[in-house]
Swiss-Prot record:
Residues 22-125 form a propeptide. It is found in: Endoplasmic reticulum. GO terms for molecular function: cysteine-type peptidase activity. It comes from Mus musculus. One of its GO terms (biological process) is proteolysis. One of its GO terms (cellular component) is endoplasmic reticulum. Belongs to the peptidase C1 family. PROSITE patterns: THIOL_PROTEASE_ASN (PS00640), THIOL_PROTEASE_HIS (PS00639). The lineage of its organism: Eukaryota, Metazoa, Chordata, Craniata, Vertebrata. It comes from the Eukaryota. This is Cathepsin W. Glycans are attached at residues 48, 112, 203, 344. PANTHER family: CYSTEINE PROTEASE FAMILY C1-RELATED. The active site is at 151, 289, 326. The gene is Ctsw. The keyword RNA-binding does not apply.
Amino acid sequence: MTLTAHLSYFLVLLLAGQGLSDSLLTKDAGPRPLELKEVFKLFQIRFNRSYWNPAEYTRRLSIFAHNLAQAQRLQQEDLGTAEFGETPFSDLTEEEFGQLYGQERSPERTPNMTKKVESNTWGESVPRTCDWRKAKNIISSVKNQGSCKCCWAMAAADNIQALWRIKHQQFVDVSVQELLDCERCGNGCNGGFVWDAYLTVLNNSGLASEKDYPFQGDRKPHRCLAKKYKKVAWIQDFTMLSNNEQAIAHYLAVHGPITVTINMKLLQHYQKGVIKATPSSCDPRQVDHSVLLVGFGKEKEGMQTGTVLSHSRKRRHSSPYWILKNSWGAHWGEKGYFRLYRGNNTCGVTKYPFTAQVDSPVKKARTSCPP
């Protein structure tokens, strides 16, 4: 039986009120076509999980069952086309997930700067779609931060190298590790903010290449080696943009990808589709995860097919969305990416839109954002 079939059967039991019963956690009830343990075993195989003692196994099994139930609730509540279910994080509590993969809660005060909206933004039309992934050699491959809480550094590095490739027509892959080792607050893998990354680049007069200064994560003590390697990219400044989504879309289409910081709560259970959350299910004020905004689009109207967690079909309305690049590897979400509804500040996507300023000394043909 496939994993999908296993989950489907288990969730039938779950919805019938039997999913979390003791009979699924023990063998006292006699043989069943499917037990929670069997589903959990497949999860362990798929994501290479093992637990050091029976008590820990039982605890993780209970968390896994709770998370599948939570994913089912999210599936029913979401107003978009998102599908929720089993992910690499399904054996973690919500608190553990936040501690392992989020950053510190972003402060209300940011570096002393003025929000910038170009004067020619207002009144100009925004293209219907924009996807920088389709432009040749602009967006790098999806990285995996692992157990290092460095989403802020990876998002900023992705922003800088994408803009450098657009402005200079030069392929560069900049060092995330340099940002971790040389960050002004010395937090390294313990979290940070994207503006810390930009200030580090300015203080060090640029960044070395990923090849010269490779990512090590939390596998070694952080020792700044910024002066040891040649700089391959640098910035003139960085800017916090307006929180107007129309202005953000225009800036993104004209200039290139930008960093945003969101509430990552729903990403623990996310598989694919457009997340259209409510403020109660994803508080836009509590942002804790930085990612790269690479494009936007609009889903066509139609019928959404049933999912593993919900076999019922529902009307799919035309939904505008953002395309975001994550740092949890290409096997998560939509090949390392995810989509958020565009137009209502879903999960706080407009709270901290930041971008580097990378200017080219030579006038070259502009690379436009592919539709």
